[in-house]
Regions:
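Acidic beta-to-alpha connecting loop that harbors the catalytic carboxylate
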Residues: 47-48, 228-230, 258-261
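Serine-hydrolase catalytic machinery in alpha/beta-hydrolase-like enzymes
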Residues: 56-67, 76, 82-153, 315-323
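Short beta-strand/loop motif that positions the catalytic acidic residue
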Residues: 218, 224-226
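Bacterial N-terminal signal peptides that target proteins for export
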Residues: 1-10
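N-terminal cap/lid segment of alpha/beta-hydrolase-fold proteins
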Residues: 27-81
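Bacterial N-terminal signal peptides
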Residues: 11-21
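Primarily recognizes the serine-hydrolase "nucleophile elbow" in alpha/beta-hydrolase
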Residues: 136-218, 232, 236
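C-terminal catalytic histidine-bearing segment of alpha/beta-hydrolase fold enzymes
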Residues: 251-348
Length: 348
């Protein structure tokens, strides 16, 4: 999905549907969670890398940043019990209510902690829908790894049972945080996510997708959940992506939801059209190989020059117009798929 340069009308519609992230009240600064703090908002150190290469190559500049996240521990968790946990990464509209009112509650009901990141608020951004360059995609991933490190230090969280779950733009981080070069370059020492979940994910095609090949991804399993009527990020692209990731050696499954559009986890069933929103055309052949840092045409495997990338983008990838629509029955089906996956992967 190409999220860049939504026009004002589309941005306004987007914000009406998604809400916007902002600086939260009563945020407690923390360097770690060793004291075992309870539920609430916490701010902690992260970074704002400019590109994915800056994530991979630790010698490159990574400007210091502060991020924040809201912690939801399962109710009545015994002090001597370590729970599994999930880091939730929002999309272009920032943190939206259903992340906490639906997803965090669903996870808590299964005895799983939830840590909902606000990537945008501490960086002074409400939404990147109109201009994705306001916050780099690499910053999302840096924040997810920072959250992993915080959770791993909590005495009631099992550091080996922490998953990441991303929504739309956040799905890009959910997938890329499983890429071996990114783990080696940016994950906290000795840590990695135990599972990766991408809901109506961006980045299944185009330059934000990772070339799936042996050695590109870690062995930790992936789950994609996607609507078959999603016209913002296409099911066919995510299905192909999951199949190629599996073929390269990382277990990846996809659950398709019939009659379901983008942003199906919203409470509101009202369909909102975003006629000026930019996106990636179905079947865009571009991808990025993290093992040799080259743009490629996935049809041929050919490495591409910057000029060729621009040419293909213009001809086969850049497009406008999409829609979003809440669907509670689809959301419940997605919730079941997520919990079933976590039961298998995190032993909950």
């Amino acid at each position: 999905m190409d999220f860049s340069k939504l026009r004002p009308l589309a941005c306004g519609l987007w914000l009406a549907v998604f809400g916007s992230a902002g600086l939260s009240q009563n945020v407690s600064p923390a360097t770690d969670f060793k004291s075992g703090p309870g539920n609430g908002w916490y701010s902690f150190a992260s970074s704002s890398p400019a590109t994915v290469i800056d994530l991979i190559q630790s010698s490159r500049a990574r400007p210091a940043a502060t991020t924040q996240a809201e912690l939801f521990l399962p109710p009545n968790l015994p002090k001597d019990v370590k729970s599994a946990a999930v880091v939730l990464v929002h999309g272009s509209g920032g943190v939206y209510p259903e992340l906490t009112t639906y997803w965090a509650k669903l996870l808590n009901a299964q005895g799983i902690a939830a840590f909902v990141i606000d990537v945008f608020g501490p960086r002074g951004v409400k939404s990147t829908a109109e201009d994705q360059s306001q916050v780099t995609f690499a910053s999302d991933t840096a924040d997810a790894f920072a959250a992993l490190g915080m959770l791993a230090s909590h005495p009631q969280i099992d550091p080996k049972r922490i998953a990441v779950m991303g929504f739309s733009r956040g799905g890009i981080t959910a997938v890329r945080s499983g890429a071996v070069p990114i783990i080696k370059g940016a994950a906290p020492a000795g840590l990695r996510f135990a599972a990766h979940i991408a809901l109506y994910s961006g980045g299944c095609a185009g330059m934000l997708s990772v070339t799936p090949k042996p050695g590109a991804f870690s062995p930790e399993p992936m789950l994609f959940v996607h609507g078959d009527e999603d016209d913002y990020a296409y099911l066919s692209d995510c299905r192909t992506y999951a199949q190629r990731i599996s073929a390269a050696g990382t277990p990846a499954e996809l659950v398709a939801l019939p009659g379901t559009r983008h942003k199906f986890d919203l409470d509101s069933p009202k369909r909102v059209n975003l006629p000026l929103s930019t996106k990636t055309k179905e079947g865009c052949p571009l991808e990025y190989d993290l093992l040799d840092l080259k743009a490629r045409d996935r049809r041929s495997g050919e490495a591409l020059s910057a000029d060729k990338v621009k040419e293909i983008s213009k001809e086969l990838c850049d497009a406008k117009g999409a829609s979003v629509e809440g669907n509670r029955s689809a959301r419940d089906a997605a919730g079941k798929a997520v919990i079933d996956f976590l039961k298998k992967t995190l032993a909950v």
